Amino acid sequence: MLYALWCTDKKDSLQLRLDTRPPHVEWLNGLNAEGKLKFAGPTLNAEGKPMGSLVVIVADDAASAAALAAQDPYAKAGLFETVEIRPFNWVFNNPEA
């Protein structure tokens, strides 16, 4: 099943995001190689600066999705104010549909 990880950064944490980006990208590449990543990218504020992340992953259940989310270097660094994990139904433009 697909799960959306909707992550919101803590206020004034752009530098932490930038500093932690290389291991975060490495983590995403690992998920991709394992077939667990569907898509990912930053959410942006009105000025076009990153303020969070949207990551859609494959997991057996919500607990497995939460365990994967906890492995994100951004999460480990304390970047996120909140992380919402929700089942996701990719209807339009799904290349596997």
Predicted features along the sequence, with ranges:
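Conserved, structured core segments of small domains
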Residues: M1-A97
